[in-house]
């Protein structure tokens, strides 16, 4: 259910874009993201940091898009989020000396430090590449292509990279954890 909620604002954004325009889609995205955040609080009495950061960025960049009637702001939001994710991963590894991926999954998985570091760097690189791809597609290709890329392309890339990460993790699990 939680994973569905995470994708709900994206589905709403896409539907409103197809039915109306980028500005209606942006308004719907802000409202849907707020509703998901409120629902998460009511249902689980908890709001994840990533969800809160995403909402703030959606509200700020979406608000700027609507106020200035300029879709460039909402297009930048994707890259800014990915840059923040990549930055957090890199800072966790080089400054805090414990990769963020390990902080998130380390209680459930026993992996060598080198595996955590490689996985953390791989995700940071993934977010950097996705952010750069977003810039290219958002500002050099037609808007409808960007919307499709944002909704389907980035979602598919993230799912594929998550599966590949799972395979990488599985290969490095201790034998007793593989069963």
UniProtKB/Swiss-Prot annotation:
Keywords: Cell inner membrane, Cell membrane, Membrane, Transmembrane, Transmembrane helix
Major localization listed first in the record, in broad terms: membrane
Pfam families the UniProt entry points to: IspA
Topology relative to the membrane: Multi-pass membrane protein
Entries under InterPro entries matching the protein: YciB
Residues annotated as signal peptide: none
Localization annotation: Cell inner membrane
GO terms for cellular component: plasma membrane
Transmembrane stretches, start-end: 22-42, 50-70, 76-96, 121-141, 149-169
Superkingdom classification of source: Bacteria
Family statement: Belongs to the YciB family.
NCBIfam families, sorted: ispZ (TIGR00997), PRK00259.1-2 (NF001324), PRK00259.1-3 (NF001325), PRK00259.1-4 (NF001326)
HAMAP family the UniProt entry points to: YciB
Function: Plays a role in cell envelope biogenesis, maintenance of cell envelope integrity and membrane homeostasis.
Name of the protein in its database record: Inner membrane-spanning protein YciB
Species for this entry: Salmonella dublin (strain CT_02021853)
Gene name tied to this protein: yciB
């Amino acid at each position: 259910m939680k994973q569905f909620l995470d994708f709900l604002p994206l589905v709403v954004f896409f539907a409103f874009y197809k039915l109306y325009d980028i500005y209606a889609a942006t308004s719907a995205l802000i409202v849907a993201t707020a509703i998901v955040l409120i629902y998460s609080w009511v249902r689980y009495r908890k709001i994840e940091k990533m969800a809160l950061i995403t909402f703030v960025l959606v509200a700020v960049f979406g608000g700027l898009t609507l106020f200035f009637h300029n879709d460039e702001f909402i297009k930048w939001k994707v890259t800014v989020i990915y840059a923040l994710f990549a930055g957090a991963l890199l800072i966790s590894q080089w400054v805090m000396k414990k990769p963020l991926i390990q902080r998130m999954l380390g209680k459930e998985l026993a992996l060598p430090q080198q595996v955590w570091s490689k996985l953390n760097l791989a995700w940071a690189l993934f977010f950097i590449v996705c952010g750069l791809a977003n810039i290219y597609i958002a500002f050099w290709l037609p808007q409808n292509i960007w919307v499709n890329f944002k909704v389907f392309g980035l979602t598919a890339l993230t799912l594929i990279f998550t599966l590949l990460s799972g395979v990488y993790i599985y290969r490095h699990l201790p034998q007793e954890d593989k069963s």
